[in-house]
From Swiss-Prot:
Keywords: Cytoplasm, mRNA processing, mRNA splicing, Spliceosome
Family: Belongs to the CRIPT family.
Alphabetical list of Pfam families matching this protein: Cript
Single GO BP term: mRNA processing
GO MF entries: microtubule binding; PDZ domain binding
Record's subcellular location: Cytoplasm
Top-level taxon of origin: Eukaryota
PANTHER family the UniProt entry points to: CYSTEINE-RICH PDZ-BINDING PROTEIN
Main location: cytoplasm
Record's function text: As a component of the minor spliceosome, involved in the splicing of U12-type introns in pre-mRNAs.
Protein name, per record: Cysteine-rich PDZ-binding protein
GO cellular component entries: cytoplasm; dendrite; spliceosomal complex
C-alpha cells in the first residue's frame, strides 16, 4: 500500500511506453535510442547488494523490505493500513480483521 504522494517516487519499468505524442521513449525528446537494451545499459539502476543502495529492514517485523525507499514491508503496511514508504495512514482498519497470509 502506497499513498498518492509516494506513488510518484516509485520506479519505472524497463519496458518502453506505448507510442503516443509526448511519450518519454521517443527519440526527438532525447529519450530512448533505437535498438538500445535498457537492461544492459543502465548500470546505475542495477541492484548491488553490497553497495549503498541495499534494501532496508522493516521497522515493525525486521524482515527485508523489497522496495527501495520503503520503511515497512508490504505485509505490515497492509495489516496496519499505512503507506509502506512514509507510514502515513491510508486505510481505516478499526473494524477489519486483517491478515497477511
Amino acid at each position: 500500500m502506497v499513498c498518492d504522494k509516494c506513488e510518484k517516487k516509485l520506479g519505472t519499468v524497463i519496458t518502453p511506453d506505448t507510442w503516443k505524442s509526448g511519450a518519454r521513449n521517443t527519440t526527438e525528446s532525447g529519450g530512448r535510442k533505437l535498438n538500445e537494451n535498457k537492461a544492459l545499459t543502465s548500470k546505475t539502476a542495477r541492484f548491488n547488494p553490497y553497495g549503498k543502495n541495499k534494501f532496508a529492514i522493516c521497522r515493525i517485523c525486521k524482515s527485508s523490505v523489497h522496495q527501495p525507499g520503503s520503511h515497512y514491508c508490504q505485509g505490515c503496511a497492509y495489516k496496519k493500513g499505512i503507506c509502506a514508504m512514509c507510514g502515513k495512514k491510508v486505510l481505516e482498519t478499526k473494524n477489519y480483521k486483517q491478515t497477511s497470509v
